[in-house]
C-alpha cells in the first residue's frame, strides 16, 4: 500500500514513479523505515528529524513535516485495519524527475520480512569488512554524505551478498584505521563491564561523528537504558573490543536487536543479558507513546 503526501491511497499495481524519476535512475533521494507495532508507527518524530537532516545533507527541499505526519497516520491506520501483523513503513523522498520537477514523496507499508523475524529470534553471524574510510572520513570528506540515509544502497546490498557467500548473515564495517563503524543497515551496540564493576553492564556504540548514520533505535535505547540505571556511552571501539564484550547487537528500527552469535567465524559465548537487552529495545521502540 502507498500513500502520497496528498493523502491519496494507491493500491499495489497502480503506477507511481515516472521512468526518469531520480530515485530510480540515480538513487538520488533519502528514506526512512519505521516499524508499525501494536497499532502505531514507532518513533515517528525521531525518523522525521533524521529524514529532515538527510534531506538537508542532500540539498533537497525541506520536508513538509505536517504532510508527512498525516501520510504516516493514514498509512498506519489502513495497515492496522487490514491486519494485526507488524508492518514495515517506509518514507521515500527523491529529487523528482530528471528533467526537473517537484520532489517525489510517498509512504509505503509492507509486511515485515521473514529475515527480520529470524534475526530477532536467532541472532546472526557477522563478518567484519573494511569500509574504505578512516574514522574521521565524515569530516574530511563531507561529500560522501555518510551520515545521510540515502536511497543509494547498492554498496550496502552488495556487501550483504558478499557476506552471504562467506556463510554470514550480516556485516560490521570497520574503518581503514581499525575502528568499528556500523552495519550496512544497523547500529553496533556492545555490552561491557560497568566502570564500577558489578551491577548493570555498560552499553557502548561508536561515536556519532564517525562516518556513520545516527541510529534512531540506538538513541531511544540509550534513553530507556539510562532511566533504568545502565551506563551508556559513545566510544571508539576496535574489533578486539567486540570479542572482549559481554555481547554484540546490530540494532535497527525493523530488526530491533539482532544478537551477533558468531563473528568472523568465531562462535561467541551466550551473553547473560540477551533477554534483558531485547526487553530494553522493545521498550525503547515505543518510548514515544
Swiss-Prot record:
The keyword Transcription regulation does not apply. The lineage of its organism: Bacteria, Bacillati, Actinomycetota, Actinomycetes, Mycobacteriales. The record marks 26 as: Important for dual ACDL/DAAT activities. Disruption phenotype: Deletion mutant exhibits a growth defect in liquid culture. Mutant is significantly impaired for folate biosynthesis and exhibits minor defects in D-amino acid metabolism. It shows a marked and selective accumulation of ADC, while the levels of PABA and downstream intermediates of folate biosynthesis are markedly depleted. It also exhibits a selective and genetically complementable defect in D-glutamate pools, but not D-alanine pools. 2-oxoglutarate binds at residues 252, 254-255. Its EC number is 2.6.1.21, 4.1.3.38. It comes from Mycobacterium tuberculosis (strain ATCC 25618 / H37Rv). The modification N6-(pyridoxal phosphate)lysine is found at residue 149. Pfam families: Aminotran_4 (PF01063). One of its GO terms (cellular component) is cytosol. GO terms for molecular function: 4-amino-4-deoxychorismate lyase activity; pyridoxal phosphate binding; transaminase activity. This is Bifunctional aminodeoxychorismate lyase / D-amino acid transaminase.
Amino acid at each position: 500500500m502507498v500513500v502520497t503526501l496528498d493523502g491519496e491511497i494507491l493500491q499495489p499495481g497502480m503506477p507511481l514513479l515516472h521512468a526518469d524519476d531520480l530515485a530510480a535512475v540515480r538513487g538520488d533521494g533519502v528514506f526512512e523505515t519505521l516499524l508499525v507495532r501494536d497499532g502505531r508507527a514507532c518513533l515517528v518524530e525521531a525518523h522525521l528529524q533524521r529524514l529532515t537532516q538527510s534531506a538537508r545533507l542532500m540539498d533537497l527541499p525541506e520536508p513538509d513535516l505536517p504532510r508527512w505526519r498525516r501520510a504516516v497516520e493514514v498509512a498506519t491506520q489502513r495497515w492496522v485495519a487490514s491486519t494485526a501483523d507488524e508492518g514495515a513503513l517506509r518514507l521515500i523522498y527523491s529529487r523528482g524527475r530528471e528533467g526537473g520537477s517537484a520532489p517525489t514523496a510517498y509512504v509505503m507499508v509492507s509486511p515485515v520480512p521473514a529475515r527480520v523475524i529470524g534475526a530477532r529470534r536467532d541472532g546472526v553471524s557477522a563478518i567484519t569488512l573494511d569500509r574504505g574510510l578512516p574514522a574521521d572520513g565524515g569530516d574530511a570528506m563531507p561529500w560522501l554524505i555518510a551520515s545521510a540515509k540515502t536511497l543509494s544502497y547498492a554498496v550496502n546490498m552488495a556487501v550483504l551478498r558478499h557476506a552471504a557467500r562467506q556463510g554470514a548473515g550480516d556485516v560490521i564495517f570497520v574503518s581503514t584505521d581499525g575502528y568499528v563503524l556500523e552495519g550496512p543497515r544497523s547500529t553496533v551496540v556492545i555490552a561491557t563491564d560497568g566502570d564500577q564493576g558489578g551491577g548493570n553492564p555498560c552499553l557502548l556504540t561508536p561515536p556519532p561523528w564517525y562516518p556513520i548514520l545516527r541510529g534512531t533505535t540506538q538513541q531511544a535505547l540509550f534513553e530507556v537504558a539510562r532511566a533504568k540505571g545502565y551506563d551508556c556511552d559513545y566510544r571508539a571501539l576496535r574489533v578486539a573490543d567486540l570479542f572482549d564484550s559481554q555481547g554484540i547487537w546490530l540494532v535497527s528500527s525493523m530488526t530491533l536487536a539482532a544478537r551477533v552469535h558468531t563473528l568472523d567465524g568465531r562462535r561467541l559465548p551466550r551473553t547473560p543479558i540477551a533477554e534483558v537487552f531485547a526487553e530494553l529495545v522493545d521498550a525503547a521502540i515505543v518510548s514515544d507513546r
